[in-house]
Amino acid sequence: MLKALEKAGILVEALPYIKKFSGKTVVIKYGGAAMVNDQLKEAVIMDVILMKLVGIHPVVVHGGGPEINGMLDRLGLKSHFIQGLRVTDESTMEVVEMVLAGKVNKEIVALIQRFGGKAVGLCGKDGGLIQAKKRFELVKNEGGARVPTDIGFVGDVVKIEPGLVRELADRGYIPVIAPIGVGEKGESYNINADTAAGELAQALKADKLVLLTDVEGILRDRKDPSSLISSLRIDDVPALVEEGVISGGMIPKVACCVEALQGGVGQTHIIDGRLPHSLLLEVFTDKGIGTMVLK
Amino acid sequence: MLKALEKAGILVEALPYIKKFSGKTVVIKYGGAAMVNDQLKEAVIMDVILMKLVGIHPVVVHGGGPEINGMLDRLGLKSHFIQGLRVTDESTMEVVEMVLAGKVNKEIVALIQRFGGKAVGLCGKDGGLIQAKKRFELVKNEGGARVPTDIGFVGDVVKIEPGLVRELADRGYIPVIAPIGVGEKGESYNINADTAAGELAQALKADKLVLLTDVEGILRDRKDPSSLISSLRIDDVPALVEEGVISGGMIPKVACCVEALQGGVGQTHIIDGRLPHSLLLEVFTDKGIGTMVLK
Amino acid sequence: MLKALEKAGILVEALPYIKKFSGKTVVIKYGGAAMVNDQLKEAVIMDVILMKLVGIHPVVVHGGGPEINGMLDRLGLKSHFIQGLRVTDESTMEVVEMVLAGKVNKEIVALIQRFGGKAVGLCGKDGGLIQAKKRFELVKNEGGARVPTDIGFVGDVVKIEPGLVRELADRGYIPVIAPIGVGEKGESYNINADTAAGELAQALKADKLVLLTDVEGILRDRKDPSSLISSLRIDDVPALVEEGVISGGMIPKVACCVEALQGGVGQTHIIDGRLPHSLLLEVFTDKGIGTMVLK
Amino acid sequence: MLKALEKAGILVEALPYIKKFSGKTVVIKYGGAAMVNDQLKEAVIMDVILMKLVGIHPVVVHGGGPEINGMLDRLGLKSHFIQGLRVTDESTMEVVEMVLAGKVNKEIVALIQRFGGKAVGLCGKDGGLIQAKKRFELVKNEGGARVPTDIGFVGDVVKIEPGLVRELADRGYIPVIAPIGVGEKGESYNINADTAAGELAQALKADKLVLLTDVEGILRDRKDPSSLISSLRIDDVPALVEEGVISGGMIPKVACCVEALQGGVGQTHIIDGRLPHSLLLEVFTDKGIGTMVLK
Amino acid sequence: MLKALEKAGILVEALPYIKKFSGKTVVIKYGGAAMVNDQLKEAVIMDVILMKLVGIHPVVVHGGGPEINGMLDRLGLKSHFIQGLRVTDESTMEVVEMVLAGKVNKEIVALIQRFGGKAVGLCGKDGGLIQAKKRFELVKNEGGARVPTDIGFVGDVVKIEPGLVRELADRGYIPVIAPIGVGEKGESYNINADTAAGELAQALKADKLVLLTDVEGILRDRKDPSSLISSLRIDDVPALVEEGVISGGMIPKVACCVEALQGGVGQTHIIDGRLPHSLLLEVFTDKGIGTMVLK
Amino acid sequence: MLKALEKAGILVEALPYIKKFSGKTVVIKYGGAAMVNDQLKEAVIMDVILMKLVGIHPVVVHGGGPEINGMLDRLGLKSHFIQGLRVTDESTMEVVEMVLAGKVNKEIVALIQRFGGKAVGLCGKDGGLIQAKKRFELVKNEGGARVPTDIGFVGDVVKIEPGLVRELADRGYIPVIAPIGVGEKGESYNINADTAAGELAQALKADKLVLLTDVEGILRDRKDPSSLISSLRIDDVPALVEEGVISGGMIPKVACCVEALQGGVGQTHIIDGRLPHSLLLEVFTDKGIGTMVLK
């Protein structure tokens, strides 16, 4: 009978979180290991469906996982580089869009539907959702000066038109979004998925932005999982970067959180997608999980 | 980390039940030990609030517990009997109503509000909710014939007017109902709480009627808790009564379930209110609890 | 035929008042003789129903009448005094609540229902309607200093949560409210009914607050009913208190009106509940009745 | 004080009628003396506004009074007769329409607006309200046979399109209707106002049709007002016609009532428009007034 | 096949205009030749219906055409003049109102209905639409001073109550309005139709005000239609008046446009009603037509 | 000025069709030349946007054009055949889905958005829109018997879930649908686009199904465009097939129309997509275009 009591206890523990987030929007950047491993994939889907069922509005923004590279390989498309920066030429962009919006996106949708949720797959073209323009990276030229350089169809977000996402969410659907932006002439741009999630969270005035990653969160000592920093504030970031605690691939993720917070998002989280149901644990339990970045 | 995974598993296990009962009405007869013990009381309240939060419409019908007798004693009101049947005279009825509608009912309401739910306490007079008339019990007279006998202000339900309960439930409130009926002239009647819950469940076209009792459910061998009959059908009832498996105080409870099922209620449950969170376990877990009576 | 014409004239006279108050809220403090005498009781109920029918939203806040003392006597509960101030101990509060919320309140509800209206009986616990805290009266100690003194479960209003009352009123119900407040831990407090009515009128942004009393209104000469002051302004009050025209039990009633007016209530009225249909006459006729206090 | 009590009594007497007719539609044929005398006119307007204010939906269909003939005279238009039947030629019809829809109709509207109501004046052309076709009267020819004869722009109702009237009534307006019908080519037809009122009452599924006339109602002895038949059933009509009790101009009025009743109208009334506020007295008092014809 | 392509091209050309004006209000002053010639009349009606069908809200304000003078003549009513200004005495006003509101207005309504639209005819009395007061013209007295002079029932707009027009437009009707104003005592006033249209356009926050006239628009050289000024700004007006380009009857029309623009109307147009479908061409084609006056 | 009049005439000619189809659903199968030629593509998009603007609900179902084969070639995927029937293996299906749902679909969406419409691209997985199962073609085996044969991921429609399409259409979006079906386990199936359009039209209770093809319609003499059969009934079909007038690729198209008509669609059309704006001409002009098949 103890087991039963524990069950009940866990359900009751979720109560204040359900109450707190009821009717609120949570934007989830879905990527990394959790998109590859079947068991993890299913766990994420179940978590998202459960959130929807208890009255939260989850919005999923996904990356492309290894599938894009696989397809580029099969087509024999080789990447071209400018000063070490990969260039997304038109053929590559075509493949990126097809894989993201036509395969990965629709697979996630089908999985949600199969487990009892209602989902709609969108890209940035649908309803003018993600309006973008070409990004110019600053690249050192021969003279050593950093000049804006065309790296192809990689885009910066110009405007988010969140109406369609809101309407779908309000009518019981889970919007699943491929981070393809659309330019003025209808051309496609590849948008970084973290960035797209962050911008969308701002436009939707989301209460939470959750980035599913392949690390435990921010560790004070990268080799020691027990050194996890479970919560930090925007003001703490510069010092942590200085000290090298936030470094490498974690820098853009933290930057994305900071920008989202400054744009009005309530809380941001960098959590470990390799742990099954990390999303659920983050949202519905007392302890939370990973690193929370707050204003 | 195992602990976390288990937590998630239990939340995910609840998913199909949340989906199944979302927007549905569950009428709960709240009585017995679960109204006396503070810890049990709190557990029932938490269960009801959680049900409401995830989109179910719980409706609570409560008994009076030991408080009525306590107040009758303090007032020196002694019960009068006719052929062994207790008579509810006007003074007694006055006390019953005050204690039920003015004390027990409002205490439950205050408890729900305190733990974060929204509740409204009603009796059968509010919005004409429970319309009743005097019940005449068949009592053997001196000649041995069973004649209808006036046993005072004990009532039979004439009509349920469920509008108010529905409106409150739809607007986010948990209706808490004292089983006081109202007669044509505005007089009060004491209604059996199980009966009131069953009638209300029918009028609301509830999906579930749950009776919180002080037994494990229906036991094949009353001394052996492991002999619990976890599910039975209406058709099985006569034989079980014949065999004495259903006997004593369990007979009216089962009768109440049968009537509710025949009146259109989806499922009925006799569960053990002495077990903390038995309500939650019944609704949100795979195993269920107690005895389910089905059509 | 003259009779008929007069009838019509009276109905037509009501026309501008119906127009003026259509959709507006009128809070009525119901107490005194009008709660004791059966004919007066019925007249008040009819008046309230008529107001509702023509599109006004009446909200009734009632006192306890002599019933509380009757029950306290029957239970042999004797009042305890501190420096002449009656103390409401826990046993007394229990009785006050039961009688107010479980008996008087539900009787009024049953009467409205019986005469064709729709009513719901509430106390301050329902929907967190009247949130209160312990009141400390300033009492002279032995040294003659006035110190805050615990007089038991007598409360001051901390906050009114008017949502439930509005929702019920909008859906065609007449809310009937027992002035029991609820503390942070769910404990009950006895609230002065005039005060509760005044606070509720403010929270509901009521257009009218009407206090049914056992006097004609404010009389310049207490022995001469013809000296009725039919209208006065807040600014006139201090002088009238000075002169002794407003004195005794009239002081808190006028204070209640003044506070309500300062809190945004349109008009306040002190009228004679001993006169049948005084409420109706106040609202629907040219002459009004009793004393109106205006800003 | 007695006066006040009487006032209240009359208001309370209206209560069940307000309740009964709340949200119901009452079609009023407004004509005769009540359209000529200024005091009577004002009384009718007040009655209609009061009905609207208490939640009834009055719809006014008016006749033309003496104004049409006045204008025909001023224009020197002389009526042309066929076998004693007046013919409405095109010039006459033009005047009828202008006076009815452009003068009488708008005057009533302006009066309602001036006394605080909201009104919209319509004729049968607005929203296709009254669709009509030419009526052919059966007229004896030289040979004595009754043949259908063209009497000009007099019309029979082909179809009522009640949508516009309902929409206006639901939004708080009192529709005021001139009985001008519209033919397939947009041509105008003069429709008998009683007939138009009766047809409209059927199309609107009205609860009451009230014909304001210049007699007390149906009198058993035309010379004795005390011989008023206050209520009769459809089945009684043939005998009363036979006996001559219903005769002359009363025959088409009663026929109009009978047809309305058969078309689903709840009650029909022939009342005395010469009595001020007869409409109000009919609707809101116990005694009613005039003759009620029931199914 | 070329023909078909052209057809399609014209429909496609209308696309941006449909999009631009969808849900917007266009007030049309309907007068002059377009009210006399049957073919022009029909073309205007078709244009208005088409506008409604594609989601625009046209509101028609009409003049009286030659019909008023015709009726005045038939009645032998001769105009009385004060210093050259025609006086609208009570008899004249009666005729004006009957003809405008009872004949011209309802004919337009019938025509719209006949061609498949839904229309309601209103005058300024309906719903208190156009509230007016007597206008006093400044007239030179014998001493040569300009003194305010009573010229009878000619009115200035005091207030527009646009609620009824909006409600009808929202429910699919085309409001057709006779420019009769109503005074405080319910008396009628003749309002200049251009002025009424302009005031209504302001009160409705219309996007367009279109005046149908009997000229091509504003011509730089009145004898040369090719000298049409297709667009001008408020600031250009004084100079054009100075130069005599805007003169005579065009002055009040331009003044009406200027006032409407200053009152918040988006665009105003003076177009040639003698050209069939000029309204349609103005709204739905690239070239527009007539003279547009802009802020 | 003649030109202007013609313009107006064409707009007015569209009026009855706008009226007729306002609020109705038109399903368009978009394929063939109209998907390849840029000018035709743009014309179709403009037509669809215009339909939406005037209140019609167009729903676009598209084919894949030559793009699928292009991508298959680039990937070196060769088709495998069974008895002459092409087999869609898993790799091929993956490409079909990516190209249809990720490239062609989103390009159409982007085009609609760019020209001012609002569009959402869906495939059969979104909201469970097209539920399918594997199709088994009857193929002659060696013994000559026709046996059901697995031809890979080609599907038959099991169920259409039209909710999402309706919700989007009601909220102003043009749904653009790639004919990918989803199986019970979330697997993808290639569905014939004509069939998908026909099934969707039935599920949506569409008023029109329009198939854009690369022929003029059904020609009695295939070499003579003037022999176009502009309208035929279901009953005429068998004889026309017998005579060879309906033959080859036209047979499944006509079958699709017949099935749609039997499933409740109002009208079906086979029109020439090679003609610019054929869609517009079919819907908004008197002559229609291509062949209409009616019940």
UniProtKB/Swiss-Prot annotation, chains A, B, C, D, E, F:
Pfam families: AA_kinase. It catalyses: N-acetyl-L-glutamate + ATP = N-acetyl-L-glutamyl 5-phosphate + ADP. GO terms for cellular component: cytoplasm. Keywords: Amino-acid biosynthesis, Arginine biosynthesis, ATP-binding, Cytoplasm, Kinase, Nucleotide-binding, Transferase. CDD domains: AAK_NAGK-C (cd04250). The record marks 29, 253 as: Transition state stabilizer. Pathway: Amino-acid biosynthesis; L-arginine biosynthesis; N(2)-acetyl-L-ornithine from L-glutamate: step 2/4. One of its GO terms (molecular function) is ATP binding. Substrate binds at residues 64-65, 86, 190. The keyword Cytoplasm applies. It is found in: Cytoplasm. Its EC number is 2.7.2.8. InterPro entries: AceGlu_kinase-like_sf, AcgluKinase_fam, ArgB, Asp/Glu/Uridylate_kinase, Glu/AcGlu_kinase, NAGK-C. The keyword S-adenosyl-L-methionine does not apply. One of its GO terms (biological process) is arginine biosynthetic process via ornithine. Catalyzes the ATP-dependent phosphorylation of N-acetyl-L-glutamate. Belongs to the acetylglutamate kinase family. ArgB subfamily. HAMAP family: ArgB. This is Acetylglutamate kinase. It comes from Heliobacterium modesticaldum (strain ATCC 51547 / Ice1).
